[in-house]
Every structure is written in C-alpha cells, then in structure tokens.
Amino acid sequence: MHDNILIGPDAHGRFNLQMLRAFEGAGSIQRGKHKVNDGVYLSCDPDAAVAGRYESSSANMLQLRMQASGNTRWQALHVELGGLCLHQAAVFGIVARSVAPASITTRLCLRSGNGDHFVDSFFPKTMVSFNQASTHLDVMDLSSNPDLPKQAEWRDLILFFRSGEVSLTLLDLRLFAV
C-alpha cells in the first residue's frame, strides 16, 4: 500500500493512474473481473468466452491483447475514482495516448454509483487508436449532463472496448476535474 499525497477532487483517480504508470507486471485476462493493480481492473462479460493477456511496464502503461467469441456484452478497463465530488467542477476530462496495430475504437464513460445502483455518463467523443501513437482529449461539460450526480459513493472511469478482438497499448492516461 502506498500513501496518496495528491490533493483535489480527482486525487483518488490520479493516484491510481500514477500507481499504474509505475507498475510492472503481467497477467491473463478471462471473463469476469481481474485486478491489474490497486484501483485498476479489467471487467469482461462473465457469460462470454474471453481470453488474453495484459502487461504493464515503464514503456507502456498497459498493453492489452484480448480475444472474445460469441455475443460478448462488454470488455472494459476500470479506474476507481473513489467518491469524486463534482459540486465545484465545471468539466471532467481525460487525456489518453494510445497505439494499436490496427485502428480500434474505445468508448469512455464516467460511472457514478450509490450502493448497487449506478449511472453511466459517456464522453461525447469516441477514442480511436491507430498504428502510430496518438492523443485523445475529451471533456464532459457537467452543466449539460443533468443525469450525472454531482455526489456519488463511488465512481469509475471506464474504457469500453469493442466486442471481439482487442489489441491496444495505452501509453498514458490522465484525468482532471476543473
């Protein structure tokens, strides 16, 4: 366990991403939920046939290789944001750098939960990863998102990957609430 000395409403999420950038390890991906590092996990449809590997190193924040067959409902990367309070924020945003051997799209979402109930709020843009490193910047205008609760018991930043084969390297991921 490491100490989080970051401040601000988004400190919990920024700390989890900082720890992922420093993490070096690998593991297998199967259906269900799989911890990558503290506060970061992969979630795949438990009813689907999903297999793959992930690897994190100093050169690549997270490299994913997944294969899913059948009617896969979701394949996703979750970053826990704690109880991120958005009362004083105007926007919530992300900056992601990625690369993929073939173009692939990823939908980004802020999930806000209270108990077992949650609300998904999707960012307006779709992230596209190419065969050369690219940067994706997206912001969610909180005033134009009335279904997004300003306060929640827990929140996750979720990257929803397309169903089927996923081959993607996340070079860096940053988030901010301002």
Segments predicted by a language model, with ranges:
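Extracellular carbohydrate recognition and processing domains
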Residues: 117-152
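Beta-strand acidic-aromatic groove motif in beta-rich domains, primarily in extracellular
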Residues: 101-113
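Short carbohydrate-recognition loop motifs
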Residues: 49-72, 126-132
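Secreted extracellular polysaccharide-interacting domains
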Residues: 65-87, 115-119
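Extra-cytoplasmic beta-strand recognition segments
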Residues: 80-104
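Extracellular carbohydrate-recognition regions
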Residues: 1-48
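Intrinsic-disorder/low-complexity, polar/charged segments enriched in Ser/Thr/Lys/Arg/Asp/Glu/Gln
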Residues: 61, 76, 89-93, 135-137
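Extracellular beta-strand ligand-recognition surfaces/modules
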Residues: 138-177
